[in-house]
Design a protein with these regions (language model features):
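Short N-terminal helix/helix-N-cap motif within the alpha/beta-hydrolase-1
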Residues: 153-156, 338
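Residues immediately C-terminal
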Residues: 150-151, 165, 181
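Loop/turn-to-beta-strand initiation segments
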Residues: 137-142, 167-173
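Charged, glycine-rich active-site and insertion segments that engage polyanionic ligands
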Residues: 1-51, 57-60, 67-68, 132, ...
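Conserved P-loop NTPase nucleotide-binding/switch module
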Residues: 162
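A short local structural element in Rossmann-fold oxidoreductases
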Residues: 81, 156, 183-187
Length: 345
């Protein structure tokens, strides 16, 4: 399994310490890393895997110079395998060979299939078969699953025996934002490790180092998660646009950035709904500056809106008519702040 690009875990200074502790102090064959993707939990898992596979004697971090490190940096190490859903691959900009490759269609005239949100049973079975083969470089083999809760029930059950009795030298890294979404039988076979992510000061310094203007606004917009804030900026949300967004949506004057997907738009609207409910409850908003929010809306409208967005979240990756859904979402949001019309005399 090869990938054309590898995230640079060395660019996230807050993961070096936790990665060192996990790689050198945790002796279990199966680890469950729990943390937010926007805080760098996936990059943390990669750094742990690279430490385990580094061939420099006594290394407690990837040396970056040995053959194994070079193979890992190009995602061509034969003893490392990562299982990611097609959708996650697309979001990370990775091109992955083998069972998890995005289906681009089988010929002219055939519709392009939407990337899957699941780690498929075929990929899990193929990975299990891979674990049973000898190490190509005579050291450990590492299987990483991200996000692990993207496995469906069949795939999860297929992995159980390997988690319980892995072949000699095989280590597994399961990465999830919410470990409770995994089967209890999976969780019980892993050592769970919580990753808190960077401190607010570390997150802000890193984001400013990425060239983000008015970084505090973007960081708040991303719930304090710096990688998510960088993605927001890449999606066309600068600080000024983010501050103007709530009232523009309430007035029906907001245009989503070019290329904004339905899931991304839904996430933005859920954040606005969260903060609007906070204002209605005399609480502090989390994602938007308080002064940027429209006047408090009726609680029943906000509650209905929140439930509608939650229902959409369960299927917003399906190949529906995206422009139509976008228009509907914006109209629904505007209606939350619409004043009731007076009765005719």
């Amino acid at each position: 399994m090869t990938m054309t690009a590898a995230p640079d875990d060395t660019a996230l200074p807050w993961i070096a310490g936790p990665a060192h502790d996990i790689a050198t102090k945790q002796r279990g064959h199966a680890l469950l890393l729990q943390g937010h993707p926007g805080a760098g939990v996936f990059e943390l898992a990669l750094r742990v895997a690279r430490t385990w596979l580094c061939e420099t004697e006594g290394a407690d971090a990837p040396c970056g110079r040995c053959t194994a490190c070079h193979l890992l940096s190009s995602n061509s190490h034969p003893d490392f395998r990562a299982l990611l859903p097609e959708l996650t691959q697309a979001e990370l900009g990775w091109s992955v060979g083998g069972s998890e490759t995005v289906d681009a269609g089988d010929g002219e005239g055939k519709a392009k299939k939407k990337p899957s949100k699941e780690i498929k049973i075929e990929a899990v079975r193929d990975a299990i078969s891979w674990t049973q083969k000898s190490s190509s470089r005579g050291r450990a083999k590492v299987l990483l699953l991200f996000p692990a809760d993207a496995m469906n029930l069949v795939a999860s059950n297929a992995l159980l025996k390997t988690l319980e009795e892995p072949p000699q030298g095989v280590r597994l890294l399961l990465v999830a934002e919410d470990a409770e979404r995994l089967l209890p039988t999976l969780r019980s076979r892993c050592q769970r490790i919580l990753f808190a992510g960077p401190t607010p000061e570390q997150a802000l310094a890193w984001l400013e180092g990425q060239g983000a203007a008015n970084a505090p606004v973007l960081l708040a917009a991303a719930g304090g998660h710096p990688l998510s804030a960088r993605r927001l900026a890449a999606d066309g949300f600068d600080a000024a646009a983010w501050i103007a967004l709530p009232k523009r949506i309430a007035d029906g004057r907001w245009e989503p950035p070019a290329g904004a997907t339905v899931p991304r738009l839904r996430e933005v609207l859920q954040k606005l709904c969260h903060d609007a409910m906070a204002v209605a409850a005399d609480a502090t908003p989390r994602y938007f500056p308080a002064a940027s929010l429209p006047p408090a809306a009726a609680w029943i409208k906000l509650s209905d809106w929140s439930q509608s967005l939650a229902r959409l979240a369960r299927h917003d990756e399906h190949p529906f008519n995206a422009p139509l859904i976008t228009d509907s979402l914006l109209a629904e949001a505007k209606a939350v702040w619409a004043k009731p019309r007076g009765r005719a005399a």
